[in-house]
Amino acid sequence: VIWQDFADIDVIRVGGVYYASASTMHYSPGAPVLRSYDLVNWEIAGHSVPVLDFGAKYDLNGARGYVRGIWASSLAYRPSNRTFYWLGQIDFARTYIYTATAVEGPWSRLTTIGTPYYDAGLLVDSDDSLYVAYGNSYNFV
């Protein structure tokens, strides 16, 4: 058990290991990835977003990025290329996708999507296709 507030958690299982990703709002590094072998005892394995390099306000140099950082992320594992995918929206403006071959990292930014996919879910289908489902009043895939 970790004494921490991990909001918007997404849990996946890869083999016999469980991984969870969470929102971190304004903290850097962001999007912690937790690891558990029993769903009770958890440890921090890494961070999907190594640094919040999304603008000066995240450096706390006179601007304020509080509660404008990482929200509502999703984590997936793609067995075909042995890669973890992290998807999350930042600053209510864009969606970012990061990848790594191990949850400990290194994680790197794969792409940026110009729309904020809030509360999105990332799915690797049985045919190896990647899907993102998101929405509020309406759902999109």
Predicted regions and their residues:
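Carbohydrate-active catalytic/glycan-binding domains of CAZyme proteins
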Residues: V1-V141
